[in-house]
Design a protein with these regions (language model features):
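Glycine-rich phosphate-binding active-site loops on the catalytic face of alpha/beta enzymes
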Residues: 127-147, 185-193, 234-253
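C-terminal helical cap(s) of enzyme catalytic domains, especially alpha/beta-barrels
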Residues: 204-207, 245-273
Length: 273
C-alpha cells in the first residue's frame, strides 16, 4: 500500500508542476504572514501530554470513518475542546482529503495546522506553505536520508515546522543521522500492514534523546493509553479516528484528555541512540 501511495504521489506532483511552478510559489510566499508555531504550541501546552487532533474522513484500511464529514465544523469543535494543534489530511486518493481544507480551517481557528500527506517532493513543501500549513509531515519509511535532510532544510527555510515520523529503530537511526529533528513522531501503526501497537512508542522513546519532543501517533483510544505513552516520555499525541467516530467531538476530546490538565512532568528517557 505504501508503495502504491508513493507512486500515486509521483504522478500527482508531475501534473501539478505543469501548472503553478515551484518558483512562482516561492515568490508568492514572501508576502505571506508568519506561520503559527506548531512545535511551540505542543511544547508550551499546560497539559502533561499535548494534543494534535486530526481532521480525517477516511483511510485505506478503514474506509469511510466519518460519513457526515464537515472539516470546518470539526475544526470548530476541536477549537471549542481546546486542542493544541490540528492535523489536516490533504491526500485525496486514499484518505479523501483536500488541500483547500487547510485555508478553510485556518480562517476559522487560531491553532497551528499540520498538513498530513505523503511528502515526496520539494514542490509539495512549497505548496504546503502557500496553502496555509504551519507544519509538514515527513515519513521516514518513504524517504532516503538525503531527501529527509533536503526536505527538512527547505521546510525550515520557508518557515514551516517539521514533524518527522518513524516506526522502528532503523528509521529512527536514519533520521537522527540525517538531521537534528525539532519534533519526532512515532507511528504506532505499521504503514505496511496497518496494525497498531502502543509498545512501538514505549520502546522507541527509550532510544530518543530527552531534548527532542516526541508525538505518539495512532491507536490511542482511552485516557489510559494517553497516560501510558505520556509516562514513557511522549510530549504529545496525534489522534484522528477516535474523534471522528464520535458524534460529539468536543466530548470525545475531553474524555480522552481528562487526566492531562497538570503541568508537564520531566520523564526520564535515554540520551543516546
Amino acid at each position: 500500500m505504501l508503495r502504491k501511495i508513493v507512486e500515486q504521489k509521483k504522478g500527482e506532483v508531475a501534473i501539478l508542476r505543469q501548472g503553478t511552478s515551484l518558483q512562482q510559489m516561492l515568490t508568492e510566499m514572501k508576502a505571506l504572514p508568519a506561520t503559527r508555531g506548531f512545535v511551540n504550541a505542543l511544547t508550551t501546552s499546560p497539559r502533561k501530554v499535548s494534543l494534535i487532533a486530526e481532521v480525517k474522513k477516511a483511510s485505506p484500511s478503514k474506509g469511510i470513518i466519518r460519513a457526515n464529514f464537515d472539516p470546518v465544523a470539526i475544526a470548530g469543535s476541536y477549537q471549542e475542546a481546546g486542542v493544541d494543534a490540528i492535523s489536516v489530511l490533504t491526500d485525496e486518493t486514499f484518505f479523501q482529503g483536500e488541500l483547500r481544507y487547510l485555508q478553510m480551517i485556518k480562517e476559522l481557528v487560531p491553532q497551528p495546522l499540520l498538513r498530513k500527506d505523503f511528502t515526496i517532493d520539494e514542490y509539495q513543501i512549497a505548496q504546503s506553505r502557500v496553502s496555509g500549513a504551519d507544519a509538514i509531515l515527513l515519513i521516514a519509511a518513504i524517504l532516503d536520508s538525503e531527501q529527509i535532510k533536503h526536505f527538512y532544510q527547505m521546510a525550515v527555510e520557508i518557515g514551516l515546522d517539521v514533524l518527522i515520523e518513524v516506526h522502528d529503530q532503523t528509521e529512527l537511526e536514519q533520521v537522527m543521522s540525517a538531521v537534528e529533528p525539532m519534533l519526532l513522531g512515532i507511528n504506532n501503526r505499521d504503514l505496511r500492514t496497518f496494525t497498531t501497537n502502543l509498545d512501538t512508542s514505549v520502546d522507541l522513546l527509550k532510544l530518543i534523546p530527552s531534548g527532542i519532543p516526541v508525538v505518539s501517533e495512532s491507536g490511542l483510544a482511552t485516557a489510559e493509553d494517553v497516560h501510558l505513552v505520556g509516562m514513557a516520555g511522549a510530549r504529545s499525541i496525534l489522534v484522528g479516528e477516535q474523534f471522528m467516530r464520535q458524534q460529539d467531538v468536543v466530548q470525545a476530546v475531553r474524555e480522552l484528555m481528562q487526566d492531562q490538565h497538570m503541568k508537564p512532568q520531566v520523564n526520564s528517557r535515554g540520551d543516546t541512540i
